[in-house]
Regions:
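Metallocofactor- and cofactor-centric catalytic cores in central/energy metabolism, strongly enriched
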Residues: 1-238
Length: 238
């Protein structure tokens, strides 16, 4: 395994045996597969978007947000649950590939589209799809920075969506960003621009979540509360 997505990572360079957070190597491998499948879905979805082809936007958005959110630190360490998402993603990716073929949409040659998703190949495919698959450290860092931005954006979007607030332009951006991350020819200039655009999209997602929360619960106001100690059990809300 190799993971350096949080500031607590081992020696400040990356966890390679087990995560400081407690994440097992098998869980890290499952997450690498899920991210690879997400890139595959993103590649095809982005190509369909550019061609103006109709598709199930809600299903794509739900999968991408759920998959990316699932891989943030301490969100989900259940290997079987993560691998179920991998299977779901493979099914969605294959369906989108078929849709692209039916609409005459040409897809790029990418490793994320070649893997057949067979369970017997999980372990080997995870090794090929990890963070270190990218040799150039600068390119790797820019792509990973984008991915971490997308993960945060996915979390905001999923919470907003649960409160009936959605914005398909953000889902389209996720697909585009994943497609660029999957492109082995993407250069530093392209990726620096992508990082900045990811930040802009993240702010837009935060605004969407704020709208969702205030629409559902109202705007926060200064309120007096009891700071005393009670006799019954309570819940601390920060």
């Amino acid at each position: 395994m190799f993971c350096y997505q949080c500031q607590e990572t081992a020696k400040g360079t990356g966890c390679t045996l087990k995560g400081v957070c407690g994440k097992a190597a098998t869980t890290s491998a499952a997450m690498d597969l899920l991210l690879a499948v997400s890139r595959g879905v993103g590649i095809v979805s982005d190509a369909l978007n550019r061609a103006g082809a109709a598709k199930d936007e809600k299903e794509i958005g739900h999968f991408l947000c759920d998959a990316l959110f699932c891989t943030i630190t301490n969100a989900n360490f259940d290997d079987a649950d993560i691998l179920q998402r991998v299977e779901k993603g493979i099914t969605l990716r294959n369906r989108l590939v078929k849709l692209a073929d039916e609409n005459g949409v040409t897809l790029p040659e990418r490793a994320e589209l070649r893997w057949d998703g067979s369970k017997a190949s999980y372990a080997e495919e995870a090794k090929r799809q990890g963070v270190l698959r990218i040799a150039n450290e600068d390119i790797r860092s820019l792509k990973e920075l984008t991915i971490y931005g997308l993960k945060g954006m996915a979390a905001y979007y999923e919470h907003a969506s649960n409160l009936q607030q959605e914005d398909l332009t953000l889902i389209h951006f996720m697909a585009e960003a994943l497609a660029i991350v999957a492109d082995p020819e993407a250069d530093q200039a392209t990726l620096i621009d992508l990082v900045l655009r990811t930040g802009q999209a993240g702010v837009k997602a935060m605004a969407l979540l704020d709208k969702a929360n205030t629409s559902a619960y109202g705007s926060p106001v200064i309120t007096k509360v009891n700071l005393g100690v009670g006799s019954n059990p309570g819940i601390l809300i920060s």
